[in-house]
């Protein structure tokens, strides 16, 4: 493998991981802005709509450790791509949800994908970067998460 190819691959991996982690993190809080609108659109109360947020966060919290194990067993790339696909599918279902229960279920699907993305991201970066550059790459990913 040539040095140029290796350099290109590691930066592509960092960009992919940063995008996936950013989307998963952003989705955990951005829905809060829309809660009053969701309450109005679905003609329901805040007690029902709050589960849109809780379902996503609870799913990630429950699945992030098992997702890490799945990544170790099935391979980083395959699991990361599956995480992106599941997250995207969940996002599509969220956009098409006709009711709050279906929206909550769609957020659970999103949470499964997000858990795969979040658990696998640091492992992908650790594998892609040499030891002397690893800290900077992980720091860059941390900056993206906190942005």
Predicted feature locations:
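Transmembrane-helix bundle of Major Facilitator Superfamily
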Residues: 3-147
């Amino acid at each position: 493998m040539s040095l140029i190819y290796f350099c290109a691959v590691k930066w592509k991996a960092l960009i992919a991981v940063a995008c996936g982690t950013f989307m998963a993190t952003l989705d955990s809080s951005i829905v809060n802005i829309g809660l009053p609108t969701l309450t109005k659109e679905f003609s329901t109360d805040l007690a029902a709509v709050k589960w849109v947020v809780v379902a996503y966060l609870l799913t990630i919290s429950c699945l992030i450790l098992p997702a890490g194990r799945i990544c170790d067993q099935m391979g980083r790339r395959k699991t990361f791509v599956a995480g992106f696909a599941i997250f995207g599918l969940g996002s599509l279902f969220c956009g098409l949800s006709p009711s709050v229960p279906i929206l909550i279920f769609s957020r659970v699907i999103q949470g499964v994908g997000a858990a795969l993305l979040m658990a696998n991201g640091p492992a992908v970066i650790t594998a892609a970067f040499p030891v002397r550059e690893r800290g900077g790459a992980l720091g860059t990913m941390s900056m993206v998460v906190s942005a």
